[in-house]
Regions:
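Short glycine/proline- and charge-enriched loop/turn segments
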Residues: 20-21, 161-170, 210-216
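A short glycine-rich, Lys/Arg-flanked "PGG" loop and its adjoining helix->strand segment in the class I
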Residues: 131-146
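Conserved N-terminal segment of class I S-adenosyl-L-methionine
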Residues: 1-113, 117-121, 131-134, 175-176, ...
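Conserved catalytic loop of SAM-dependent methyltransferase domains
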Residues: 194-220, 226-229
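Conserved Class I S-adenosyl-L-methionine
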Residues: 223-253
C-alpha cells in the first residue's frame, strides 16, 4: 500500500469509519508524528536487512520503514498487546509482508546482534532506567550496526516566544533530554555517537504547540482537530527544511562499535 505517511491506519479495525476515511485521504492525523517521520526517516537510510522499531506504538514508523526499505525485514516491538494485534492486522491488510509485530519490553529484549538498524522514536522518555534500555538496544545491533533515536527535548519554545520545560505528558518519567545529556548516556551504554541535532524548527514547534492545545495527550476535541489538522500539517511542512540549532526534539545517530580484531598466532 502506497500513499501519504500513515495511510495504513485506514485499515485499522479499531478505528471508526470516519477515522479510516480521514487517514486514507490525509495519512496519519497527528502533526507531531508527521514532523518526526520527516525528521527521523532520512537518518535510517542505508542497505539494511533487519530493522527493529523499539517501542513502535500503533506501528506507523514500522510501516514507513517497511516501505522505505523493501529489502529489509522490519520488526516492531510494543508493550501494549492491543496495539500489537492491531498493527499486525494492518500490516496484513496492507500487504506489508516484510513487517511484523511482537509484544516486548525495550529493557528486556532478547536479541543478540540480530539487527542492522534499530529505531527508537519518543520512547526513552517513558523508561525509568533509560541507560539499561540503551544497553539492550546496543546488544540487539550487530557490530557496526546503526541506532537512530529521537526523544523530546527537555525544553521547548512556547508559541513563538521564550522557552519552558516540555509538556507534562502522562506516561513520561522525564520531560525530555538535552542533546549533550542523551549523547553522554548513549556513550555510557557503549555506543559511538555519529551525529546529534535538534529537531522541530520554529514553524514545526508552533504548529505542534497548537496541536497539543487542541487535542492534548488524550486526543480530546477530535472534531476540532480534524478541521485544524490539514492547516497545521501544511504550515509545519513549510518548516521541514529548517536546521534548528535548538528545538523541541533531539535526534541522535549512533553505532555499535565493531568487534576488536583478535590477532592470530605469530
Amino acid at each position: 500500500m502506497r500513499g501519504l505517511p500513515g495511510c495504513e491506519l485506514s485499515l485499522d479495525p479499531g478505528r471508526s469509519r470516519f477515522e479510516r476515511i480521514y487517514a486514507r485521504l490525509l495519512g496519519a492525523p497527528a502533526n507531531g508524528l508527521r514532523i518526526r517521520l520527516r525528521r527521523v526517516l532520512p537518518a535510517t537510510d542505508g542497505d539494511h536487512r533487519a530493522i527493529l522499531d523499539a517501542g513502535c506504538g500503533p506501528g506507523v514508523f514500522s510501516f514507513e520503514l517497511a516501505k522505505r526499505h523493501p529489502q529489509a525485514q522490519v520488526l516492531g516491538i510494543e508493550l501494549e498487546p492491543d496495539l500489537v494485534e492491531r498493527a499486525s492486522e494492518i500490516a496484513r491488510r496492507a500487504g506489508l509482508t516484510n513487517c511484523r509485530f511482537e509484544k516486548g519490553d525495550v529493557t528486556q529484549l532478547d536479541f543478540d546482534g540480530k539487527f542492522d538498524l534499530v529505531v527508537s522514536v519518543d520512547n526513552l522518555e517513558h523508561v525509568e532506567d533509560d541507560v539499561t534500555a540503551m544497553k539492550t538496544l546496543l546488544r540487539a545491533l550487530r557490530p557496526g550496526g546503526t541506532l537512530a533515536v529521537h526523544v523530546p527535548a527537555y525544553e521547548r519554545r512556547w508559541l513563538l516566544f521564550g522557552r519552558r520545560v516540555n509538556f507534562d505528558v502522562p506516561g513520561h518519567v522525564r520531560p525530555g533530554y538535552r542533546a549533550p545529556e542523551l549523547a553522554e548516556k548513549l556513550r555510557l551504554a557503549e555506543f559511538d555517537v555519529i551525529d546529534q541535532r535538534y529537531t522541530y524548527g520554529p514553524l514545526e514547534t508552533f504548529t505542534n504547540n497548537l496541536s497539543y492545545l487542541i487535542s492534548g495527550a488524550d486526543q480530546r476535541n477530535k472534531a476540532l482537530y480534524a478541521v485544524a489538522f490539514p492547516v497545521l500539517l501544511a504550515v509545519s511542512y513549510l518548516g521541514k527544511f529548517s536546521n534548528p540549532s535548538w528545538g523541541a526534539g533531539v535526534l541522535i545517530k549512533a553505532r555499535r562499535p565493531d568487534e576488536p580484531t583478535v590477532p592470530g598466532p605469530a
